[in-house]
């Protein structure tokens, strides 16, 4: 879910070369990482190359948005998620976007770069916040529909806040799962209760696969991811029922306020890329999810048996520049005359238009790193979010005004393509090469 490795290296090493054009081999990186002047030069350089907004957008709905982290069961078999929800308090501090240095180290590992790259990323983005009120109380007096969200390969629970915040601002509770299948750049757990009590984290980093492992391991991972989505749903419904559940994280958020807060008949699953495949796997296994939305799904991890086992409505929202024939053909395997299936493509969009990194840089660097497409990032995410809301209203039976965007589900907008821009008529196209990595997420 992060940009191609060579583009990142070119950009960031170029930044360093401008700041320190001479005697690079003699620089002590640790000493210079601690230099505020060095940091300021890098940040100024990045800003000068940005020429645009670099903030994650606020939700467009009428609700104030709160945010907290929940870990149920401190082990790596438990559930870890970031929760976005309608809030009654708008005076809290914004939420830190990437909360631990280890996540930046995980991103550098995913990029296949030196650990120093993680520290550079931390310097550039470590203080960035999202417009959600940290640990704010839940807005009482309503039962809210629930969305479980699944992140892409190399991502983690915090990197889709623009989607989570917008849904919460329209009256949803959103549980963004952090997967423990080692497809996240990084995640953590506690080895035992005493470690949890003192905050002694044990970190899991992305698993690097050999080519011959791809098919088997990716399928194992998508199955685990689906179970983690279902497990997250079960635990939230337990809390909604009033079951006492201890948050392994020492946070000032009273989970009892979630009691009787969920509309248990209005539950959906959404995911991006590897998370899009997770949506499909989850729908095939858990009928409690009434519908699903797959954002630029990466279909390779799914087994062939899944496609005929999805009775729920399913909506594919694709980017223009990521998709390819083999992937679209697999999406169309989900189609059946008696099942609700929709697909649209956002013109001028790239794979990263669905993730927060598209808002973390301005135009020039954003295009260099393929974090931004030809379409404005705010326009792209707005189209995706509005189309999602219209689909959710239709299939969850919501009494809202989201049907004003029903036309988007059909691709009726100048920035949308109904269906796909990909030609799949050439049947000689090989559906997937032996490694399955011709289009990574």
From Swiss-Prot:
Effect listed in the UniProt record for changing residue 338 to A: Activity is higher than wild-type
Short name of any one Pfam family annotated for the protein: PAF-AH_p_II
UniProt KW keywords: Asthma, Disease variant, Glycoprotein, HDL, Hydrolase, LDL, Lipid degradation, Lipid metabolism, Phospholipid degradation, Phospholipid metabolism, Secreted, Signal
Lineage: superkingdom: Eukaryota
Enzyme Commission code: 3.1.1.47
GO terms classed as biological process: lipid oxidation; low-density lipoprotein particle remodeling; peptide hormone processing; phosphatidylcholine catabolic process; plasma lipoprotein particle oxidation; platelet activating factor catabolic process; platelet activating factor metabolic process; positive regulation of inflammatory response
Tissue specificity of this protein: Plasma. Secreted by macrophages (at protein level).
GO cellular component terms given for this protein: extracellular region; high-density lipoprotein particle; low-density lipoprotein particle
Residues bearing carbohydrate: 423, 433
Phenotype upon changing residue 108 to A: Activity is higher than wild-type
Consequence the record notes for mutating residue 205 to A: Impairs the association with LDL particles
Mutation effect (residue 92 to H): Retains the ability to associate with HDL particles
Post-translational modification, as annotated: N-glycosylated. Macrophage-derived PLA2G7 carries sialylated complex-type N-glycans that hinder its binding to HDL particles.
Effect of mutating residue 296 to N: Loss of activity
Result, substituting residue 273 to A: Loss of activity
Annotated GO MF terms: 1-alkyl-2-acetylglycerophosphocholine esterase activity; calcium-independent phospholipase A2 activity; hydrolase activity, acting on ester bonds; phospholipid binding
Catalytic machinery residues: 273 (nucleophile), 296 (charge relay system), 351 (charge relay system)
Induction per the UniProt record: Up-regulated upon monocyte differentiation toward macrophage lineage.
Mutagenesis or variant effect for residue 369 to A: Impairs the association with HDL particles
Coiled coil: none
Catalytic reactions of this protein: a 1-O-alkyl-2-acetyl-sn-glycero-3-phosphocholine + H2O = a 1-O-alkyl-sn-glycero-3-phosphocholine + acetate + H(+); 1-O-decyl-2-acetyl-sn-glycero-3-phosphocholine + H2O = 1-O-decyl-sn-glycero-3-phosphocholine + acetate + H(+); 1-O-dodecyl-2-acetyl-sn-glycero-3-phosphocholine + H2O = 1-O-dodecyl-sn-glycero-3-phosphocholine + acetate + H(+); 1-O-tetradecyl-2-acetyl-sn-glycero-3-phosphocholine + H2O = 1-O-tetradecyl-sn-glycero-3-phosphocholine + acetate + H(+)
Extent of the signal sequence: 1-21
PANTHER family, alphabetized: PLATELET-ACTIVATING FACTOR ACETYLHYDROLASE
Disease linkage: Platelet-activating factor acetylhydrolase deficiency: An enzymatic deficiency that results in exacerbated bodily response to inflammatory agents. It can be associated with several disease states including inflammatory gastrointestinal disorders, asthma and atopy. Asthmatic individuals with PAFAD may manifest aggravated respiratory symptoms.
Function: Lipoprotein-associated calcium-independent phospholipase A2 involved in phospholipid catabolism during inflammatory and oxidative stress response. At the lipid-aqueous interface, hydrolyzes the ester bond of fatty acyl group attached at sn-2 position of phospholipids (phospholipase A2 activity). Specifically targets phospholipids with a short-chain fatty acyl group at sn-2 position. Can hydrolyze phospholipids with long fatty acyl chains, only if they carry oxidized functional groups.
Protein name: Platelet-activating factor acetylhydrolase
Gene: PLA2G7
């Amino acid at each position: 879910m992060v940009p191609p490795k060579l583009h990142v290296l070119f950009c960031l090493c170029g930044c360093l070369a401008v700041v320190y054009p001479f005697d690079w081999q003699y620089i002590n990186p640790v000493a210079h990482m601690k230099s505020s002047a060095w940091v300021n030069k890098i940040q100024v350089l990045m800003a000068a190359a940005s020429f645009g907004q670099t903030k994650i957008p606020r939700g467009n709905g009428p609700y104030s948005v709160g945010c907290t982290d929940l870990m149920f069961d401190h082990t790596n078999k438990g559930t870890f998620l970031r929760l976005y929800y309608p809030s009654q308090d708008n005076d809290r501090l914004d939420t830190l976007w990437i909360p631990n240095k280890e996540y930046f180290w995980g991103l550098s590992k995913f990029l296949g770069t030196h650990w120093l790259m993680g520290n550079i990323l931390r310097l550039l983005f470590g203080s960035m916040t999202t417009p959600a009120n940290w640990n704010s109380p839940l807005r009482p007096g309503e039962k809210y529909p629930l969305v479980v969200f699944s992140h892409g390969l190399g991502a983690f629970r915090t990197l889709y806040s623009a989607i989570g915040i917008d849904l919460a601002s329209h009256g949803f509770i959103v549980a963004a799962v952090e997967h423990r299948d080692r497809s996240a750049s990084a995640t953590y757990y506690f080895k035992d209760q005493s470690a949890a009590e003192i905050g002694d984290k044990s970190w899991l980093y992305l698993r690097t696969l050999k080519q011959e492992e791809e098919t088997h391991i990716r399928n194992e991972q998508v199955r685990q991811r689906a179970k983690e989505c279902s497990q997250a749903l079960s635990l939230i419904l337990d809390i909604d029922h009033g079951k006492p559940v201890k948050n392994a994280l020492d946070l000032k958020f009273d989970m009892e306020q979630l009691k009787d807060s969920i509309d248990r008949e209005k539950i959906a699953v959404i995911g991006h890329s590897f998370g899009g495949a997770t949506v499909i796997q989850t729908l095939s296994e858990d009928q409690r999810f009434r519908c699903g939305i797959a954002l630029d799904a990466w279909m390779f991890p799914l087994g062939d048996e899944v496609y005929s086992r999805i009775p729920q409505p399913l909506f594919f929202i694709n980017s223009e520049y990521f998709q390819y024939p083999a992937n679209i053909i697999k999406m169309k395997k989900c189609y059946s005359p008696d099942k609700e299936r929709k697909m649209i493509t956002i013109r001028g969009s790239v794979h990263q238009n669905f993730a927060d990194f598209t808002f973390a840089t301005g135009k020039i660097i954003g295009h260099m790193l393929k974090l931004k497409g030809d379409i404005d990032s705010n326009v792209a995410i707005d189209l995706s979010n509005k189309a999602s809301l219209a689909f959710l209203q239709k299939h969850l039976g919501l009494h809202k005004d989201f049907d004003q965007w029903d036309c988007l589900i059909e691709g009726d907008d100048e920035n949308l393509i109904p269906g796909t821009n990909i030609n799949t008529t050439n049947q000689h196209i090989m559906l997937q090469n032996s490694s399955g990595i011709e289009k990574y997420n």
